[in-house]
Amino acid sequence: MEPPSCIQDEPFPHPLEPEPGVSAQPGPGKPSDKRFRLWYVGGSCLDHRTTLPMLPWLMAEIRRRSQKPEAGGCGAPAAREVILVLSAPFLRCVPAPGAGASGGTSPSATQPNPAVFIFEHKAQHISRFIHNSHDLTYFAYLIKAQPDDPESQMACHVFRATDPSQVPDVISSIRQLSKAAMKEDAKPSKDNEDAFYNSQKFEVLYCGKVTVTHKKAPSSLIDDCMEKFSLHEQQRLKIQGEQRGPDPGEDLADLEVVVPGSPGDCLPEEADGTDTHLGLPAGASQPALTSSRVCFPERILEDSGFDEQQEFRSRCSSVTGVQRRVHEGSQKSQPRRRHASAPSHVQPSDSEKNRTMLFQVGRFEINLISPDTKSVVLEKNFKDISSCSQGIKHVDHFGFICRESPEPGLSQYICYVFQCASESLVDEVMLTLKQAFSTAAALQSAKTQIKLCEACPMHSLHKLCERIEGLYPPRAKLVIQRHLSSLTDNEQADIFERVQKMKPVSDQEENELVILHLRQLCEAKQKTHVHIGEGPSTISNSTIPENATSSGRFKLDILKNKAKRSLTSSLENIFSRGANRMRGRLGSVDSFERSNSLASEKDYSPGDSPPGTPPASPPSSAWQTFPEEDSDSPQFRRRAHTFSHPPSSTKRKLNLQDGRAQGVRSPLLRQSSSEQCSNLSSVRRMYKESNSSSSLPSLHTSFSAPSFTAPSFLKSFYQNSGRLSPQYENEIRQDTASESSDGEGRKRTSSTCSNESLSVGGTSVTPRRISWRQRIFLRVASPMNKSPSAMQQQDGLDRNELLPLSPLSPTMEEEPLVVFLSGEDDPEKIEERKKSKELRSLWRKAIHQQILLLRMEKENQKLEASRDELQSRKVKLDYEEVGACQKEVLITWDKKLLNCRAKIRCDMEDIHTLLKEGVPKSRRGEIWQFLALQYRLRHRLPNKQQPPDISYKELLKQLTAQQHAILVDLGRTFPTHPYFSVQLGPGQLSLFNLLKAYSLLDKEVGYCQGISFVAGVLLLHMSEEQAFEMLKFLMYDLGFRKQYRPDMMSLQIQMYQLSRLLHDYHRDLYNHLEENEISPSLYAAPWFLTLFASQFSLGFVARVFDIIFLQGTEVIFKVALSLLSSQETLIMECESFENIVEFLKNTLPDMNTSEMEKIITQVFEMDISKQLHAYEVEYHVLQDELQESSYSCEDSETLEKLERANSQLKRQNMDLLEKLQVAHTKIQALESNLENLLTRETKMKSLIRTLEQEKMAYQKTVEQLRKLLPADALVNCDLLLRDLNCNPNNKAKIGNKP
């Protein structure tokens, strides 16, 4: 057998430097490196259908192949000594020096050769570790051969440690390395940002949701839903004064009402039974199950095993920083699906709260994000969405129908309805959804899916490995032989011959060889296997079940096989003693990972299903039952689980003899104490007798169904097939002798067995002696009535070693006798405990504890809220402050802020002086509000210039037409600041709210690029509503909104004013910029539009904002003039246009703290208000003069235009004449060339005629010579001529002959 292609055995250059240590200690070069000396046993690539129970056998195969490379013709190399180097993030397998000596640890052998390594891969790509309980020194791990390719196979690498205690250390070190690497991978990357920007986002208004009966929507669905919503709104307004409104904390589905309607109100009704499917996709074949997950996870999951993977992908990073909230409506009790005559379930939204959402269409899902609560309120994968629709009357509304599962096994269709700002926006949303669905479908269809059905050969191997897991080798051998009997004679003979050739020396080795050849056979048969429901209708009857003639007959065969296996497999699994000690005799997967991998399993049988689940399987189940089986039906037998299950509270059905429901068992609770005591004594006698005659006393279990008698053929079957080995029986006898002295074990066994002696009606049955085989049969006959606690409470030995028959936990209703007989108190004491006073005190205590818990929860929520607020404030103010603020200044500011609350005017000189000394970063937002209040106390805007009186919350409830421009600029605003860097995080959503509210408030300005930076600076220092008030102050009171108007007239005036300032105060710099054609609009426009926030550091921008709130718009001119004057020398040194622009945009903003403080000081000392006013008047005067001169000079301008047009035409005429002359010269040259060619042609023709005449003469001469020569000479002559023609060099040789 060739080594697996996924394992690299060739030498590669090793990136590590040589280090002297090879132990698990950090090397001197890299402190984080760890090294382990191990033996590399080998590796192999796995089939996609390989499951967990198969892995120990695969590991044993690799181990055996390395120990006996000649067995079976396998050419695998023997184990080699290696050094496993853990160097973040890589795991490298390096050949160990001195590997020829097994375990040599000489000083020379401690130096690894860094030139080569066997293989390397990243630690985070390792998906699972495998222990071998048969030999604790062996372990393995699984990894994808090509991690970047989702379709690549898994590879298994097996190692052997010198000491079993070394294995946990190695695995723990690899896991720590993997966790560290995964944290690095989890950081935002460029791909995540591209995924965010590639996703389309729209602002929508959530209208409500309606429960529908079909997954396809009629054209009038949206209009019908809107009519129902309006009807509910009218009813709500009527009772608004009488009834309290719904909780404003909910996000979706606030109030559920039942609105009567006609059948056409919603969708075409369907019968009651047609809606009870399992939520499988339309068109999916029920018998064939499509695996929606890869058999092995992509990453190491510390606390989980086979976690359910997303069908399409991991979640897009578009909502990375959003706190994901669970939909509150899903926590409520969902309404039952209605009958055809039942009314529709309508859940409109609450109009009194903010219902605007961000509708994000990603690559594989739809997210509905609430900017108000900063959370994802709805997330739906494309696979759950069945259709989308747009309104006919309400053209600005749309909706989609999706599948929801309120509880496992129950699915319903919900229609969510939304409103957009315009019809064109709805068209864009619908087009985006259509394109996204098409792209996702194309990607999904290109993905290779692993299909499994009940008849798959690999599935039968999986079931066999599950059944023999944890069994002793002799018992496993019996199970394997029974499985081999289902194969054809040729296949059995072939496997038998191959195994005998290898001469196994033990049952364990023989089992490994049989599983090896059986796996090879199953893989070969799987290639030609046709899944159920995929094969043609007419197939030969001689084939195996997967090629059966009809699906009905095949189903019957499956049920017959299940009935045949139900007795045997349960008996074999009952004999598997010692769950924690014996399940690894043949090698098992890490128990910790496996117990966690099935912790969420509730009512699904892993033993009767393929390992894959359909896409619509409930996420809480690790395995899905066969679709045609009822997991609660009596004939559905639950496998004896080999995993550790937590208690579960799922319901079960009991197969009672008289066919009554579960409530029939209630008479068991009303048995008289005398009958119970007599039953208990009879059971104890039976227990003693059975102990003396049975070799399996530990198998007594509780049984709540009536006793059954084993048929004779089953008795003979179990006597022949269920015989134990002598060693095993001796162990059981020893265990029996040891447990006979255990009083607690006797008590539990008698209490459980007493339940067997009672019938369903409550009458006692006379106990009789039964054999241990009959007891096993009684347990197997109806295992659904079995509870794990009853079996675990038999005795101390069984509780620790035997495995549960069911993962379900007992209840008081199911096991009353166990609860009754397990205590040692008398009935009088039990009655005393139930006295009313004690019960009342217990209730009082419970109520007080609950009240205390609620208070503690509220306090914890307050503490968490305050902690989150402090953390958010810390993140917001994460910038370096310019200029230190002294304690005295801080105290003075505190006093000023007290006056702010009283709205008292303060002396502006004092404020100017105090502001010059500094502003504390933590109180900056309050100080800005204080400065705004002082300005408004002195200056009052006229009524015409004041902003509309609309509250911030009311604005947020509306839709804005500027949503696209705002959403695009969210990622561009302070992209490096932690508060705004998270895509659609709290910072970006708050910024979206603020910009949206202002765009709705100021219809003239709307939204303009640059406002986002101003709003971002405000949000860093105050809340949303406070920032909105301050943004209105800046725009309306201070007049900044003029520069954002669509005509940009104010910005042109500002550019003229800045140019005049440079011309008057820095003439050399002005001339230098004019010579290089650099106008102020090239470098100063961002300064004015973003108030320096887009290019300069936040500390400097905050100080600029301090002065702006005090002095207004002229601060921008002061700062710009100070910046240019301070760097005048360096600007003058730049000689070209590109160098000057590069300096102004990149070098100038990169200042140190001292330069910033110097500029701020100059700004405080500068006063240019008069100059700015004069320049503005000058601009308007010049503008008026130009307009007047334009009217007076219209005629002269017309004449000048005509003269210019005439001169242009003359120039064009001259150009055409020159082109014409050039064309004439070209024509003449071409004509002369043509004449020359014609003369050459005539000469050539004459020469050809002459040569033809000569040729004819030569031919005549040759004919005459042929007639004169004899025939032999002619032949020799022809040969000679032929040789001469073939080899022209021979002419020279012939000519040289004498």
From Swiss-Prot:
Modification N6-acetyllysine, positions: 477
Sites bearing Omega-N-methylarginine, chain numbering: 577
Gene Ontology biological-process entries: cellular response to insulin stimulus; negative regulation of vesicle fusion; vesicle-mediated transport
Top-rank lineage group of the source organism: Eukaryota
Domain (Rab-GAP TBC) ranges: 918-1112
Primary localization: cytoplasm
Molecular function as annotated in GO: GTPase activator activity
A Pfam entry, by short name: PID
Matches recorded under SUPFAM superfamilies: PH domain-like, Ypt/Rab-GAP domain of gyp1p
Subcellular location: Cytoplasm
Record PTM N-acetylmethionine, positions in chain: 1
PROSITE patterns for this protein: PID (PS01179), TBC_RABGAP (PS50086)
Modification(s) after translation: Phosphorylated by AKT1; insulin-induced. Also phosphorylated by AMPK in response to insulin. Insulin-stimulated phosphorylation is required for SLC2A4/GLUT4 translocation. Has no effect on SLC2A4/GLUT4 internalization. Physiological hyperinsulinemia increases phosphorylation in skeletal muscle. Insulin-stimulated phosphorylation is reduced by 39% in type 2 diabetic patients.
Stretches with biased composition (Low complexity): 672-682
Known tissue expression: Widely expressed. Isoform 2 is the highest overexpressed in most tissues. Isoform 1 is highly expressed in skeletal muscle and heart, but was not detectable in the liver nor in adipose tissue. Isoform 2 is strongly expressed in adrenal and thyroid gland, and also in lung, kidney, colon, brain and adipose tissue. Isoform 2 is moderately expressed in skeletal muscle. Expressed in pancreatic Langerhans islets, including beta cells (at protein level). Expression is decreased by twofold in pancreatic islets in type 2 diabetes patients compared to control subjects.
Biased composition (Pro residues): 608-618
Positions with biased composition (Polar residues): 750-765
Modified residues (Phosphoserine): 262, 314, 318, 341, 344, 566, 570, 588, 591, 609, 617, 666, 751, 754, 757
Residues the record lists as Phosphothreonine modifications: 568, 613, 642, 763
Keyword annotations of the record: Acetylation, Cytoplasm, Diabetes mellitus, GTPase activation, Methylation, Phosphoprotein, Repeat
Chain positions covered by the region annotation Disordered: 1-31, 241-287, 317-353, 586-685, 725-765
Disease: Type 2 diabetes mellitus 5: A multifactorial disorder of glucose homeostasis caused by a lack of sensitivity to insulin. Affected individuals usually have an obese body habitus and manifestations of a metabolic syndrome characterized by diabetes, insulin resistance, hypertension and hypertriglyceridemia. The disease results in long-term complications that affect the eyes, kidneys, nerves, and blood vessels.
Function statement: May act as a GTPase-activating protein for RAB2A, RAB8A, RAB10 and RAB14. Isoform 2 promotes insulin-induced glucose transporter SLC2A4/GLUT4 translocation at the plasma membrane, thus increasing glucose uptake.
Protein name, per record: TBC1 domain family member 4
